[in-house]
């Protein structure tokens, strides 16, 4: 995204809980038992057979009540630390405890089978951030290279200014317990968050508190920033409401969690956005921003008044899980029909997949800073996927720029500038106070999470001018995709090994390199195998 685009700015600064439930901690409290709501998800094999996994979710530590060890006195109230209990990073980590959560009563978080619902406003709590668990003390780790990740989402109750997000970050599986002696709570209590903005609003980072240098927010009564930030790679599979959506990878120099200090963090909280070790902007695919304004929304090709399924594929250069990430592909399934990601209509940007050519073209067409490339691009994003990533599901509003980066014109005074139009919401929309008071009953539902080889996690038909052709789930383990104009040829009009050689609407090479054959994978995609 552009240097001015703060689309991820306050993902890590969601409105944080009630006055008593607004912080993270390192020790474990005993006032409320921590019981993780169950959430099942599936692992699929080629051919379409899937196995159900018994998972659960936990609430991020920043939303929880933090109090003194063996006392109910708050360590943190509103947006201010209680320095009578802790006045240094070390003392807070040792003397403050993180307590269990009343998921439905306090936070409006409920699960049923494979479905998770996040309510926006519940009492005095606003928004939430949750993680998928492998067991009671570990986050579920996903390695998605040469795999597809699928989920169903209902965004029908997300108006302008809200973001129901599903994404991955390279957090420690145990939440840092094994690395930091003061961290007793760990993943069980939602400790260890990091992302590509290097958030400094976290109360605890890497076994220490973030109290030293803490500055309360001037426009948010629950948040502030400290001296330290928590950096790691971030893959935004889904940032969306009922108006707009975006798919955005954010690499870092080092994929795993690293701690930064003050303005050296870069990202949202620093005077120099690009001073840090991570890419705060990303290489985004927002159909509306790419000129396809009739694709996503109420009554459009993907109709956001109804649930739909989102399929994302992580293609490698050699077609194996040990290869390097070369493309990210996306399509949708709604009403039994597979819907391809639309191709860009912006001059100078072609195709409908995220690859190096697309990112370079978007950078040039929109006049953006080369942050994505400078931090390793898809290669480093692939390193994060190889390292394993944690699944995050959240609902938030934006105290920075009112979510205009997602669903409106941003910057608001740049109407007509290439890349500024991101959605149809007015530039006056998204003010958090208004959204919270007028749209407090909003919610998002994520369900039917699946992971597996290409074409194993979904089924559907393809619309072909009034008739529908059925595509079975899992008919092959090679990559399925939408129509694409990505560069997978050898430069001589011949598609390279693993490259695309055909499919509905394909205008690229149809002849394969010597030793490979153009093989039909599905109506949208044929591949040189």
Swiss-Prot record:
UniProt xrefs under InterPro entries: CBD_sf (IPR035971), Cellulose-bd_dom_fun (IPR000254), ConA-like_dom_sf (IPR013320), Glyco_hydro_7 (IPR001722), Glyco_hydro_7_sf (IPR037019)
Disulfide bonds: 501-518, 512-528
Function according to Swiss-Prot or TrEMBL: The biological conversion of cellulose to glucose generally requires three types of hydrolytic enzymes: (1) Endoglucanases which cut internal beta-1,4-glucosidic bonds; (2) Exocellobiohydrolases that cut the disaccharide cellobiose from the non-reducing end of the cellulose polymer chain; (3) Beta-1,4-glucosidases which hydrolyze the cellobiose and other short cello-oligosaccharides to glucose.
Encoding gene, per UniProt annotation: xynA
Biased composition, class Polar residues, residue ranges: 425-438
Pfam families with a match to the protein in the record: CBM_1 (PF00734), Glyco_hydro_7 (PF00840)
Enzyme nomenclature, EC number: 3.2.1.91
Domain CBM1: start-end pairs: 493-529
Region: Catalytic, residue numbers: 26-456
Region listing for Thr-rich linker, in residue ranges: 457-493
GO terms assigned for molecular function: cellulose 1,4-beta-cellobiosidase activity; cellulose binding
Activity control note: Cellobiose inhibits xynA at high concentrations.
Cellular compartments annotated: Secreted
Protein name (record): 1,4-beta-D-glucan cellobiohydrolase xynA
Stretch forming the signal peptide: 1-25
Cited CDD domains: GH7_CBH_EG (cd07999)
